[in-house]
């Protein structure tokens, strides 16, 4: 046999790897053809062929985690649906039934003390209604005649009967004998019978006209019924004033020369007679103007 000098090219390892990858990629069959020729120098090459073997692909268990994931997602969806249903049901009940109002907090006992009693009225204040003293329009002057002042109180008490109606509570305790004088004005029994018997029928008209007519009719009726009773009421007031408030002349005893009139008081003879009658007050000597001008300072003081 004659050996050929030519040698076959060697197969690189990268080429073999690429072929292996291609064979593994297919799923139907896998075929491998390898030829190896190893000859030293002058030797010929031999080819070795491998038989095609059908390899069975083993099925990997990759579906179990996917199925488990699907089951987990389904359970999560069911939980979400049930939670939404419960939430919607609770919202509907809240809209239908209003929430109950909380009870008010209990108030502590004895927290607020009662208001203090009003202070007693000041007896020295001019606003006190019980101090209803009337002063005369004219001053007393040098006459100091308290008898005229007492007469003024008796005459002016009739005019102040209307103002004393506001102090009915205090005056009723002071004057229990005549409560109708100092109480609020009320129509007498004769006035009530007259109004019930002789009240005319007022014409039916508007409210304004009715008010005018009724006021005029009441004023006329009051004038007719109250005027005859003014005099006895004034007499009763004077009697009560004399009983409760005694005259100043009875309480305070003044000398006779203070109760005299102005003409008698300031008469020169009356003054000299009065002062001469008392031993402690001798009458003063009268001096002429010429004598006063002629006197010196030392003589005047002596």
Curated annotation (Swiss-Prot):
Positions of the UniProt region annotated as Disordered: 32-65, 86-125, 155-210
Segments of skewed composition (Pro residues): 97-123
GO biological process, one term: response to water deprivation
Compositional bias ranges of the Low complexity kind: 155-173, 191-200
Sequence ranges of Polar residues compositional bias: 201-210
Highest taxon, organism lineage: Eukaryota
Compartments, as annotated in UniProt: Nucleus
Induction: Induced by oxidative and abiotic stresses such as hydrogen peroxide H(2)O(2), cadmium chlorure CdCl(2), and osmotic stress induced by mannitol or salt. Seems not activated by heat and cold.
Example of a GO cellular component annotation carried by this entry: nucleus
UniProt KW keywords: Nucleus, Stress response
Keyword Glycoprotein: no
Protein name: Protein AAL-toxin resistant 7
């Amino acid at each position: 046999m004659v050996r050929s000098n030519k040698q076959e090219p060697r197969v690189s390892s990268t080429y073999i790897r690429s072929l292996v990858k291609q064979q593994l990629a297919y799923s139907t069959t896998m075929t491998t053809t390898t030829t190896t020729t190893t000859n030293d120098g002058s030797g010929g090459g031999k080819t070795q062929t491998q038989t095609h073997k059908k390899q069975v692909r083993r099925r990997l268990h990759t579906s179990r985690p996917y199925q488990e994931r699907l089951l987990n997602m389904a359970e999560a969806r069911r939980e979400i649906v049930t939670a939404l249903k419960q939430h919607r049901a609770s919202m509907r009940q809240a809209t239908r039934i209003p929430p109950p109002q909380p009870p008010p907090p209990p108030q502590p006992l004895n927290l607020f003390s009662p208001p203090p009693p009003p202070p007693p009225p000041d007896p020295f204040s001019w606003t006190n209604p019980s101090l209803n003293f009337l002063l005369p329009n004219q001053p007393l002057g040098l006459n100091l005649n308290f008898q005229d002042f007492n007469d003024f109180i008796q005459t002016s008490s009739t005019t102040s009967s209307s103002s004393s109606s506001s102090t009915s509570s205090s005056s009723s305790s002071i004057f229990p004998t005549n409560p109708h004088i100092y109480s609020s004005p009320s129509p007498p029994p004769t006035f009530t019978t007259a109004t019930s018997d002789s009240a005319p029928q007022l014409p039916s008209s508007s409210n304004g006209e009715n008010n005018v007519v009724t006021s005029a009719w009441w004023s006329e009726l009051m004038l007719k019924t109250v005027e005859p009773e003014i005099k006895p009421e004034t007499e009763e007031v004077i009697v009560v004033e004399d009983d409760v408030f005694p005259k100043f002349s009875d309480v305070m005893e003044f000398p006779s020369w203070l109760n005299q009139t102005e003409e008698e008081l300031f008469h020169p003879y009356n003054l000299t007679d009065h002062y001469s009658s008392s031993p402690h007050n001798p009458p003063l000597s009268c001096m002429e103007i010429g004598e006063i001008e002629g006197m010196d300072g030392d003589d005047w003081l002596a």
